[in-house]
Amino acid sequence: MKIYVDAKAARDGNGSKESPFKCINDAAQIAQPGDEILVEPGIYREYVDPRNGGREDARITYRSTQMLGAVITGAEEVKNWKPYQGNVWVCRIDNSIFGSYNPYTTYVYGDWYFAGRSKHTGAVYMNDKMMYEAESLDACIKGEVYECSWEPEASVYKWYSQQEGNETVLYGNFQGKNPNEEKVEINVRRECFMPSKTGVGYITVSGFSINKAATTWAPPAAYQDGMIGPHWSKGWIIEDCEISNSKCAGISLGKYLDPENDHYFTYKHVKSPTQMERDAVCRGQYHGWLKEKVGSHIVRRCNIHNCEQGGIIGRMGGVFSVIEDNHIHHINNMMELGGAEIAGIKMHAAIDVIYRRNYIHHCTMGIWCDWEAQGTRITQNLFHDNQRPEFAKQLKGGMMSQDIFVEVGHGPTLIDNNNLLSDASLRMATEGVAMVHNLICGALTCVGEGTGPRYTPYHIPHRTEVMGFMTILHGDDRFYNNIFVQKWPATPFVTLRDSREGTDEENREVGTHVMDEYPTYEEWITMFDMDTDTPDMAKLETAHGSHLPVWAKGNAYFNGAKAWKKETDNLVDTEHEVQVEITFQDGKPVLATNLYEFLGDFSGSMIHSDTLGCAFEPEERFENPDGSSITFDRDYLGEHRGMRILPGPFADKTDAGKKLW
């Protein structure tokens, strides 16, 4: 059945074509498996709470009849501003409009939040641009540049709120503009399109603009909301949407509300947040965390931008998903929020998740795979400018920047055929990573560090059931057929510590030399007395806690990038100066480089799953989610690799000059 919605209809109807509903949520209350909800262009200021899910063979589809013409927003327009002082105006909002959730009394705060409790989930927007929350009315009046912002010219637009009786009083510094003549909105709803109950699966959301919700901080051991999300269900498709201006997360593929483990550390203090993450994994299994019930979502062809925690986030609920062909950019650029959950994509337990053909730039981090990146594949993506600008001061509690961060996982985590162009390409406080056919212009950081005594789960291959827990031994990493270029300065990068005082230095020298202290497989295996069938447990105790081996072959190094001292069959060019830059043709990114002039006749071998072997702890191959083998015979663009195997993401040197996205 087709159900029709039109915000511009003369009056409420019954959902027929002749008499459409005016609100999407009316359709969401009656839709049954197989139904299609057709939504006409218009502004829908409502929260859509689907009552029913579809089935695998009979999805419920919500479709904007005009691409991005139907806008679902968590905001309301405000036109009762009055002059206050200088460039500052004031308005009063009756708190009844907020119902049980007032964003202007709710702080962005919780587990793993490091930037101090001062920002609200509410926000003021002028002409679709989120304004900056001032710490005081005086700061709002002054309207000074915020020194941590990545967009300083926008940071002078300030707002401030306070409570008086049953009213929220909002002050806004509009820098000489009359807010009653501009499009000024405030967010009032926590979500835009998300079931209030779990298990509402097999829904497609296609072609909508979704924006301006008062979402909350969403760490891994808490309820994780977003402007849109499946809320612990299976089989959603979110496609061809524009997702923007969330206070915290844009799309949540995350965790349900567990009242016994919701910001436990923040509220009770007596157990570490790391312990409660482990508990969340185990409790999740009790609450239905199975391949048959949760995950297997698709997020594709979406434009996700200007969200201040993450573009896509989620703990556990995103397993077995495909995230492809998305443009994710300008995430956390305001630098008002800081903590360990911020990235273009931040997911815990990305089991068998595939991230492919995404374009990710100008984010605090590109993709952050935290815990249980088992069977995860990051392939054919373009990353650049995921680094703090030189003019921006680091936010205390803000995170270090890099294209990819893999943290405290056991693998197999596969990173192949990507262009990694920021100053830090991979932060690897983890083990069990394979990097194959990438262009790597930034450093490998945090090698052998950043894990502490944390012990994390690994799983039955291609399942969610826990197989064991182990600390991170580091190593078990593979580097095949990559190109490393020292594009950025090699001097160490000074960073503020996340939640403690002081600074640290982070590596900015490009190359696999950071693995110099790690053994080859042959060196490692000799520690285990393989020539006896009566091993001595006490004797081997030290070996069982030692670094795992590393493999490297077929890599090329330019501009001073350094090779692992035990690597053979590589190219180290110390003579030529190589340039790698992103340029734009007709608004599309193109790689400008001369590196292929200096490869000469150097080539590598075809890489297969059998080449990479198994990740050590889960004993799972680097393979497809269905268990089939991977042959790396297709490049970044999908072109075929023939008899000559060039290092890097392109099968032929001419492909590097093609449009990348």
Name each model feature, range by range:
Residues 226-228, 310, 343-344:
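Predominantly extracellular/luminal carbohydrate-interaction, adhesion, and secreted-enzyme modules
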Residues 201-214, 234-248, 260-284, 290-310, ...:
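Right-handed parallel beta-helix
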Residues 343, 398-404, 421-426, 461-468, ...:
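Short beta-alpha connecting loops at secondary-structure transitions
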Residues 2-232, 237-244, 250-252, 256-289, ...:
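Extracellular polysaccharide-degrading/modifying enzymes targeting complex plant/algal/animal polysaccharides
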Residues 451:
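A conserved amphipathic helix/loop scaffold
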Residues 38, 229, 311-313, 367-368:
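Short catalytic-loop micro-motif centered on adjacent basic/acidic residues
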Residues 442-443, 459-461:
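Leucine-rich repeat domain C-terminal region
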